[in-house]
């Protein structure tokens, strides 16, 4: 076991105990200090981010991934503001969600408490570093971060700044830490750090999620992989459908709530596809379509079986013509990742059937999948989008970083 993991694990465990009973004011003061320090030391962050970008460009990293990695003054301000916004959210810790009395006179309550020490493994998104720190701090959890090698310089600087801010705020050393060793061996050991980690949350592409699920012995909350579909029903508004798919695919193609597949009812395909594909191509999207799609719009690439299950995270879209709503639902439930799915239709009964039968964390009617986000749902910042069913599902805000403690009041009862 890597010595860095043991040292940081012990520090995190100690910090989590102190954080578990820190007051809301103490935690909020820490968050405001973090926000202030991030803005004050923006130039230091950008200097380190420049190093990461230069390395990524040398490696031939895609433009979409470079966009996830890149920071500028506006993005750093946005990150800092997101941290400050967490102060405005209600502190769930200590909340008694229910209280009931037993016939023997015992009063039993259910209280929200921190999870303890949260481990987060993620890829080339430096904003995750600050988001995760803020959410864990607000909920009284210590956090150990393991970012990707692509953003190591940016992440180390951000955590250094966060640590300095927490020290000034009087919060414990070890509240927010990051692994400096980004090797796969250390990552695997991190996934098995059961003596110190209470939960592990991976954020990234399918490869990362699979590696964590297959190797971790620490309990995992699976997040992130988004093979999201937009289904255009035969009773869809054409203009609305075009607007939704263009937004869902191109507004930020490298995020997990971006659309990766477009399914079109055969009754509307000849009218809809030429307009939609033209609009998508104008945004630089490569179309990979089924044979029926290619028969309608010839100037596209043919999709393979592999395409239907793939999360591109790029300016690529799979397009398939389907017979009806039932085939669309069947296709989504077969190839989807239970993240976010959307139907565009004017038919109420079709929309209700879609909502009921599609198995996903977020199911939309006449809206872009890009709204699956803690901020857009009104939860504030998020730790990720859970695609599993145990503990948490969908955008994970503050409450999803807590667990229950039963508190029992008696007056001498014995059994």
Curated annotation (Swiss-Prot):
EC number assigned by the record: 1.2.1.41
Tell me if Oxidoreductase is a UniProt keyword of this record: yes
- Reply yes or no: does the keyword NADP apply: yes
Instruction: Please tell me one Gene Ontology term that the record gives under cellular component.
Output: cytoplasm
What reactions does this protein catalyze? Answer: L-glutamate 5-semialdehyde + phosphate + NADP(+) = L-glutamyl 5-phosphate + NADPH + H(+)
Q: Which UniProt keywords apply?
A: Amino-acid biosynthesis, Cytoplasm, NADP, Oxidoreductase, Proline biosynthesis
What are its GO biological-process terms? L-proline biosynthetic process
Q: Which PANTHER family match?
A: DELTA-1-PYRROLINE-5-CARBOXYLATE SYNTHASE, GLUTAMATE SEMIALDEHYDE DEHYDROGENASE
Protein purpose: Catalyzes the NADPH-dependent reduction of L-glutamate 5-phosphate into L-glutamate 5-semialdehyde and phosphate. The product spontaneously undergoes cyclization to form 1-pyrroline-5-carboxylate.
The record's similarity note reads: Belongs to the gamma-glutamyl phosphate reductase family.
What is this protein called in UniProt? Gamma-glutamyl phosphate reductase
Q: Which organism is it from?
A: Clostridium perfringens (strain 13 / Type A)
Q: Species lineage, top-down?
A: Bacteria, Bacillati, Bacillota, Clostridia, Eubacteriales
């Amino acid at each position: 076991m890597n010595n860095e993991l043991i040292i940081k694990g012990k520090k995190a465990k100690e910090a989590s105990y102190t954080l578990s009973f820190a007051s809301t004011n103490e935690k909020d003061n820490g968050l405001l200090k973090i926000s202030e320090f991030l803005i004050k030391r923006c130039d230091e962050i950008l200097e380190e981010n420049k190093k990461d970008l230069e390395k990524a460009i040398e490696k031939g990293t895609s433009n979409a991934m470079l966009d996830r990695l890149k920071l500028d003054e506006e993005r750093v301000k946005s990150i800092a503001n997101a941290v400050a916004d967490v102060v405005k959210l209600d502190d769930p810790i200590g909340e008694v969600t229910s209280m009931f009395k037993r016939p023997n006179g015992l009063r039993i309550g259910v209280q929200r408490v921190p999870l303890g020490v949260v481990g987060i493994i993620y890829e080339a998104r430096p904003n995750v570093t600050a988001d995760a720190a803020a959410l864990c701090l607000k909920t009284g959890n210590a956090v150990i971060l393991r970012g990707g090698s692509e953003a190591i310089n940016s992440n180390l600087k951000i955590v250094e700044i966060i640590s300095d801010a927490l020290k000034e705020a009087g919060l414990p050393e070890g509240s927010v830490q990051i692994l400096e060793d980004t090797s796969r061996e250390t990552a695997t050991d991190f996934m098995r750090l059961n003596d110190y980690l209470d939960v592990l949350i991976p954020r990234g592409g399918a490869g990362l999620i699979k590696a964590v699920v297959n190797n971790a012995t620490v309990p995992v909350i699976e997040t992130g992989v988004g093979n999201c579909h937009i289904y255009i029903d035969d009773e869809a508004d054409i203009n609305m459908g075009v607007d939704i798919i263009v937004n869902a695919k191109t507004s930020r193609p490298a995020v997990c709530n971006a659309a990766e597949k477009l399914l079109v009812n055969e009754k509307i395909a000849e009218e809809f596809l030429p307009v939609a594909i033209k609009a998508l191509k104008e945004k630089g999207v490569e179309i990979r379509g089924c044979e029926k799609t290619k028969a309608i719009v010839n100037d596209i690439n043919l999709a393979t079986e592999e395409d239907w299950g793939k999360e591109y995270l790029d300016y690529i879209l799979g397009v398939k013509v389907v017979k009806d709503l039932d085939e669309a639902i069947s296709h989504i439930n077969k190839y989807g990742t239970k993240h976010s799915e959307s139907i565009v239709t004017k038919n109420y009964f079709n929309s209700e059937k879609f909502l009921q039968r599609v198995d996903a964390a977020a199911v939309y009617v006449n809206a872009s999948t890009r709204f699956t986000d803690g901020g857009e749902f009104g939860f504030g910042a998020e730790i990720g989008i859970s695609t599993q069913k145990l503990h948490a599902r969908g955008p994970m805000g503050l409450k999803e970083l807590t667990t229950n403690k039963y508190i029992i009041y008696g007056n001498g009862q014995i059994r």
